[in-house]
Amino acid sequence: LVAAVDGFCLGAGFELALACDIRICSPGAQFGLPEITLGFFPGAGGVQRLVRTLPQSLALEMLLTGSRLDAEKAERFGLVSRVLPSDMLMSESLSIANKIAFNAPLAVRAVKEISRWSRDHSLEESLRYGNSLRWAIGQTEDAKEGPRAFSERRAPIFKGT
C-alpha cells in the first residue's frame, strides 16, 4: 500500500498511513497522534507502528506530548520516502503502485512478509526464513516467466502462480 499525504495526517488518518508500506508527502504535510491530549491514546496500531518506524525518543515524544512532525523531519527520519510538490503527489504514488503491481505478486508478497518478520527476529533467523521463502518462490511459474521474458526481450506476464 502507498500513502500519499497532502496536508494534515493526524490521529486515525496517521495510523492508516503508518499501516502502509510506502509513504510520500507534500511539503505542507503534518503528522501526529494527538490522542494523548484528549485523555486516551491511539488504538489502531499507531503506538506499535510509530515506535517501529521512528527512533524511540522521537516516537515517544510525539506519542506522549501529541506533538507533530513536519514533512522535512518526516523525510529525514524515514517516515516518508520522499517529499514532492502537491500537484505531483497522486501521480507519483500511482506510479509507485503501478511499478509494484507490475512485479510478480508472490515475490512482492514474500518481500513484504520477510521485511515484517525480520523486525522481530535475528539476522541469522531472518536469512534462514528468507532463504526458505526464496526457494519456494523459485518454484513458481512467475519465477520461470521473469528470466524467460528477459531472454526473449519482452515484458514479463506474471500471473501469481
Show where each model-derived region lies:
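Crotonase-fold acyl-CoA enzyme core
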Residues: L1-V108, N131, Q139-T140, K144-R148, ...
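Residues that form generic nucleotide/phosphate-binding pockets
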Residues: I114, I137
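Short active-site-adjacent structural elements
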Residues: S118, F158-K159
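Short, charged, surface-exposed hinge/linker loops at domain edges
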Residues: S115-H121
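Short beta-strand->loop
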Residues: S122-L127
